[in-house]
UniProtKB/Swiss-Prot annotation:
CDD domains: ThiL. Its EC number is 2.7.4.16. It comes from the Archaea. The gene is thiL. This is Thiamine-monophosphate kinase. Mg(2+) 1 binds at D55, D128. HAMAP family: TMP_kinase. Mg(2+) 2 binds at D55, D83. Mg(2+) 3 binds at D41, D83, D215.
């Protein structure tokens, strides 16, 4: 999840502070014109259907030393492209600026960026390069929307809540390395080489489906709360239905936590969270993890018998 303005790192900002900062910026600046304005959703949508997204990474906040430069390049592209797909846009063009530090292997970083662009069918249109004390990557992706945007305000009571794939791997990887563990290579791959299901968003919009969609970059719980708030509904998440990445259970056992909690509270999964009619789940092979009801907020249901009637 993002917006026309990206939220600061969740490691240093609480959700309320993030929302207040975005509101401050949006209220202070002119925002007239777009169909979907800055701060309203995952990305901005211009009158002609162009979808625009911005994202940034810094070494100190987003890049653990275990992340290889080539994989950093890929991850950077994926993180920028993901929000365009979540809005229903087909990513087309990419520009980026980079502040290079003394640690980065520039050739490997560029190789990873190139691989990411080719993977998602995106062409480079320009950028800027400077040198500095810290590695900073800032990217912009433009895509084309064929249909209506997949707004986070589209959820309705009676909808199913679904995800495009398993979760928790990136969170388990980070927790493991911060505590001196050597996680499985599969967890590294999930953290370093995310593959957001852009084609799902594109086909949802092209097919005229009504769905609320966001990418899971800040964690399943946080993204569900964002959809519930923007749609004016309540969301139930049934934990026994949440798919968990391979290797998460081993890390969870080490820290005596429920593997599902690593999926709920993690981030950087870059799968899509989708709320929509039952036919959306069937058509796109999604995994149902809950339902949308009347009310507000998010309810975590851990016992099947505790479901709201």
């Amino acid at each position: 999840m993002s917006s026309g303005f990206k939220r600061p790192s969740p490691r240093t900002w609480r959700p309320k502070e993030e929302e207040e900062l975005i509101e401050l910026i949006v209220e202070a600046c002119p925002t007239e014109g777009p169909r979907v304005k800055a701060g309203d959703d995952d990305a901005a949508v211009l009158p002609d259907g162009t979808v625009v997204n911005f994202d940034a990474m810094t070494r100190s906040r987003h890049v653990p030393k275990e992340l290889r430069d080539r994989d950093l390049g890929w991850k950077f592209v994926a993180s920028v492209v993901s929000d365009v797909g979540a809005m229903g846009g087909e990513p087309s063009f990419f520009g980026f600026s980079v502040c290079l530090d003394d640690e980065v292997d520039v050739e490997q970083l560029v190789l990873g960026i190139s691989e990411g662009l080719r993977e998602f069918g995106v062409s480079l249109i320009g950028g800027d390069v400077v040198e500095g004390e810290e590695l900073v990557l800032s990217g912009t992706c433009l895509g084309k929307l064929k249909g209506e945007p997949l707004l986070m305000s589209n959820a309705r009571p009676g909808d199913v809540v679904a995800v495009t794939g398993p979760l928790g791997g990136p969170n388990a990887f980070v927790r493991a390395i911060l505590n001196g563990m050597e996680p499985e290579e599969t967890l590294y791959e999930r953290f370093a080489r995310p593959r957001p299901p852009v084609e799902v968003g594109v086909e949802l919009a092209r097919g005229g489906y009504r769905a609320a969609v966001t990418d899971i970059s800040d964690g399943l719980l946080a993204e569900a709360e964002a959809i519930a708030r923007r749609s004016g509904v309540a969301i139930e998440i049934h934990t026994w239905k949440v798919p968990v990445d391979e290797g998460v259970e081993e890390v969870a056992q080490e820290f005596d936590v429920d593997p599902v909690d690593l999926a709920l509270e993690g981030g950087e999964d870059y799968e899509f969270l989708i709320c929509g009619p039952e036919d959306v789940v069937k058509e796109f092979g999604l995994t149902t993890i809950g339902r949308v009801t009347e009310g507000e907020g998010v309810r975590i249901v851990r016992n099947p018998r505790a479901r709201s009637e």
